[in-house]
Amino acid sequence: MDIETIKDNIDTERIYTELQTFVVNEDQFQDQMDDSHLSVQICLQGINAEMDPYFGSRTLKHIADEGFKEEDFNIFLFPELDYTNSIIEDLLMFRTRVMILKPKTCLSYHADPRKRIHIPIDTNENCFLMIDQYAHHLFANGSAYLCDTTKPHTPINASLDSNRMHLIGMNQQLS
């Protein structure tokens, strides 16, 4: 199965509010948020509390080559995200990021080394996760989904004017 629901009743509006208040509206992210062609990736967990939450995941492009495992990304970078961090802890997630896909964009078709947990926070009917050439719509209805991203996949935001925001991480036991 490509996608399965693993948790319900997550207050995604509360997560959205926390992310908007403490993360997305930070001055350091405004250039990226204002660029209509750039998808934004913000780390919520890092290898240490001093890790830069925006550039951390990109500078460690090949985590294994740098001597780290994905499980090493387990330190909360935004301790003020009380509810969001409690959901991350409840799902035993690590290397959790906020992924914002701008309108009329997609990422390259790729496969990840592990399955990913997706919690859609802000989405619309024109957003899809293509897995192995099948389009799936993940609803922002308070569910956490385990997605088999070890298969070739890409997120697509075919909206004309709305961002797609997902909380994405991993769980050792579910990968």
List the predicted regions and their residue ranges.
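A short hydrophobic beta-strand segment most commonly corresponding to one strand
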Residues: 117-120, 144-146, 160-175
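Short, flexible surface segments
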Residues: 103, 140-141
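Short beta-strand His + acidic residue motifs that chelate non-heme Fe in jelly-roll/DSBH
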Residues: 107-109, 127-129, 138, 147-160, ...
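A short glycine-rich, His/Asp/Glu-containing loop-to-beta-strand
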Residues: 83-103
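Non-heme Fe(II)/2-oxoglutarate
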Residues: 1-88
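A short beta-strand-loop-beta hairpin characteristic of the jelly-roll/cupin
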Residues: 120-140
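Short, conserved beta-strand element in jelly-roll/cupin
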Residues: 100-101, 111-127
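Short loop/turn positions at the edges of beta-strands in beta-sheet-rich folds
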Residues: 113, 121-123, 133, 149, ...
